[in-house]
Amino acid sequence: MKISADFTVIPDDFAKAAAPEYFNGGVPVVSFPFYIDDVDPEARYLHWEFVDPDSIPVCGFEWIHWSVANLPIDALMYDFNDSHALAIPPDFSRQLPAMIPETVQGRNSSASKFLGRSTDPAVIMRYNGPQPPDKDHEYYCLLYTSDAA
């Protein structure tokens, strides 16, 4: 499987320089678009986590920005005019509960008891855009598939 995007640095709209309307509770919440190619034909579900291991020296743990589980592959729209097999559109995290309610978005690091942040599920169980306080960080989007939820 291969993940790709139309950028190599997360664009401002999806991170700390996003417009005010893209924030909720002081956190950028509009998720970035990406593509998934070379998916195993036996796979029925997608799962992923978007994490920041560079946060460990800053806050003491790897920051979880977004986690998704049990996303049915057949619920995603295939664009036969596109060269990519699957496209995750911008703002998918906020749209997902209404579009595919059986898919779970796990708690992100904003839910940590060490931070004392929001308890709003729209913040703690959705995408949280990068806001590194010290320097540019390297992020990882880890993608998994399964044949059962």
Task: Report residues per predicted region.
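N-terminus-centered regions that define maturation/targeting leaders and the start
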Residues: M1-S146
